[in-house]
Amino acid sequence: MLARFVACTVAVLALASGALAQTYPAKPVRIIVPFSAGGLTDVLGRGIANELTKLWGQRVLVENRAGANTIIAAELVAKSPPDGYTILLANDPTLSLNQYMYSKLPYDPVRDLTPVINILQSVTVLVVTPSLAANTLQELIAMAKARPGELTYGTFGYGSSTHLDTLELGTMAGIKLNHIPFKGIAEVLPAVMSGQINMALSAVAPALANIRSGRLKALAYAGAQRNKVLPNVPTYAEAGLPGFFTHGWFGFVVPAGTPREVIEKIAADTSKVITTREFDEKFISGVGMELINQGPAEYAEFLVKDRAQYARRVKEANVKQD
């Protein structure tokens, strides 16, 4: 009798799970973007939202909740109902860096947020102001060594991923640079173009048009191979500094406790969207980014390694926000 009851219960649960996946989404879905409108993450989020709206027949809305190095947006999603209707477009600070940079967070990135799909990575390019008398990485390094602490670089703020990346670049190159923190890439790149600061590490996408127009000078790309949209920009290895590799990544996470069937559906349908030729050309490889497309299990494994890497880097750089 007990065995029969258990079998019936399992069957009912299986049917319920399948039905849940088939009926989701039954109402509008929110994608929370932890940055202001118009930036790289926002554009990506809106591109995915538009395609998922078509696929699901339900509106997928983007909400911008910028501030506090993505903490505001992450807390909102972590404390939302675990039903799949609130999705965070997270990046490496959200899930890997902030827990080591801040002594207290209002969310636990491991316990409170569940990986869905790792979408893409954005490898950085070193850009300098066009008037700077350095046309190669080695010329820049020589200039920095001759003028220690004088050359300036911009980042998204103290303790940001771009801050850590540039500190690591300085250590590997044996140079000392002067840090000028900004609020985001929308402030950093104009400062480089105007000569307010000398250089910055940037994702390719927001810098691409200005590199092509000559308003920014690109000296090195931090990937294993050259980027197809910047074929004349050497890798750091080609430029004489092997081993320097930096990247940011973007992926979906949901509140812990979200049904597995809903997570799998979001992952599968997002994968369909991002692997089309049209989407890739408009939002990924066509603007200098690289597809990752890792499902929930692979994404979780990736995060374990990424967190360990950030723990080491924060310790070595000796930078903390509080």
Question: How would you label these PLM feature ranges?
Answer:
Residues 94-104, 168-172, 199-233:
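A ligand-binding cleft/hinge motif common to bilobed small-molecule-binding domains
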Residues 76-85, 100-187, 236, 249-283:
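Hinge/capping helix and adjacent helix->loop/strand transition within the periplasmic-binding protein
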